[in-house]
């Protein structure tokens, strides 16, 4: 019966990988600070939307008032946001404080499980009430045949955005 462990290995996905996306929200020296709304998604090189990974916004405002400012993340709103029913299960979350926040996805996550072989971007967009807006793209290829890290550095609303893939 030593065949079963070997069969289990053969049944594993051919390109299993863990994907980590870290987003730094910098401390800003402003009179009135509001935590930014942040959207993270996957797009093709032609900027067509593939999948949403996270949307951080004010979930707890009465009468869903927090949803009103989602459109300030203009690219997210145009690509996919306006067609979504919020909150989105498994995607929506509360705004985050200053610091670095890491999201981890395995190969079974719906966004990566059916992702065809090809080149893509992880897109991170941030917008802040009484503040600015910033968008960063981090290119990657899927599936990954070796471990790698790619990053982009923000200038205002975002700090370092880093994506690492570990097959």
Task: Walk through the language-model features, giving the residues of each.
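Sec/Tat signal peptide C-region and signal peptidase I cleavage site
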Residues: 12-18
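Short amphipathic, basic-aromatic surface patches that mediate peripheral association
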Residues: 21-33, 56-60
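Cleavable N-terminal signal peptides
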Residues: 3-4, 14
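Short coil-to-beta strand junction motifs in C2/discoidin
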Residues: 32-39, 117-120
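Glycine-rich, aromatic-bearing surface loops/beta-hairpins
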Residues: 98-103, 111-167
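Structured domain cores in non-transmembrane regions
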Residues: 45-115
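Calcium-binding acidic motifs and repeat modules
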Residues: 31, 44-47, 160-167
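N-terminal Sec/ER secretory leader and immediately downstream segment
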Residues: 24, 39-45
